[in-house]
């Protein structure tokens, strides 16, 4: 009899498809419930707002009592039974981009400098959130004010703007050790609206600094306390790999990683 897994989060398709290919009976709680998700799961439930997610998970447990639970974006901090991967207590620090910045600095990782208001150009980003869709380069107090209104006045930080190639590393971690599985070049949306939104990936990353990035990622993953598959985002220049964020869960590049690794 096949084992079963509930995949829960804002978007779950990449993990659900992988689990189905591995032979699991898959159930999903997902914001979108698009056709290529519903085609591979035994049952699914949609939600609109993230505060509805815990109740949807409870309902799926009542229906199916899955053997395991895997959380994706938006569900990293939920306390759920039978959870696989990084615990909410370990993930919590990396859900705050300011705390992630401090973590990188503490362990001596190359990272864009944090800037104060009035220092431009700067990369503005909300302290919470995923996917990069609210990130923006601002060049004046006026641009910063307009951006802050766009993100509905959420807490934010400013970083030195490093021009380079967006990339990431997929790692496997045990809570104290880690290995880099694959490097990825990220595809961002571009254009005038949400230009830094994640839109896809190419694996492996062909950039000359990819091996340097993988070495740094292994150190980050080992020090992070995370468990299982995780992703670390970077910007690559001609001379350095700058760490940007930690995703303490399966990352959006999972599909290209699996295709590249076979």
Each predicted region: which residue ranges?
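ATP-dependent carboxylate/phosphate-activation module, predominantly the ATP-grasp catalytic core
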Residues: 160-225, 236, 247-262
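N-terminal beta-alpha lobe that positions the nucleotide/phosphoryl donor
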Residues: 54-67, 71-120, 129-132, 139, ...
């Amino acid at each position: 009899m096949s084992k079963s897994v509930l995949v829960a989060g804002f978007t779950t398709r990449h993990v659900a498809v992988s689990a189905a290919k591995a032979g699991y009976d898959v159930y999903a709680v997902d914001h979108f419930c698009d056709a290529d998700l519903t085609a591979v799961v035994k049952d699914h439930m949609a939600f609109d707002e993230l505060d509805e997610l815990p109740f949807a998970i409870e309902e799926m447990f009542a229906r199916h009592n899955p053997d395991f639970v895997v959380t994706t974006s938006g569900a990293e901090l939920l306390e759920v039974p039978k959870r696989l991967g990084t615990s909410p207590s370990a993930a919590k620090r990396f859900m705050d981009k300011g705390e992630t910045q401090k973590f990188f600095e503490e362990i001596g990782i190359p990272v864009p400098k944090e800037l104060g208001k009035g220092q431009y150009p700067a990369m503005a980003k909300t302290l919470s959130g995923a996917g990069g869709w609210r990130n923006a380069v601002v060049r004046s107090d006026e641009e910063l004010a307009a951006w802050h209104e766009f993100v509905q006045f959420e807490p934010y930080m400013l970083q030195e703007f490093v021009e380079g190639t967006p990339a990431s590393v997929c790692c496997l971690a045990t809570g104290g050790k880690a290995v880099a599985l694959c490097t990825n070049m990220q595809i961002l949306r571009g254009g005038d609206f949400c230009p830094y939104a994640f839109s896809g990936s190419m694996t492996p990353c062909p950039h000359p600094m990819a091996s340097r990035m993988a070495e740094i990622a292994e150190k980050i993953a080992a020090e992070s306390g995370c468990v299982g598959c995780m992703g670390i985002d970077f910007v690559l220049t001609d001379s350095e790999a700058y760490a940007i964020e930690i995703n303490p869960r399966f990352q959006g590049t999972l599909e290209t990683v699996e295709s590249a690794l076979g």
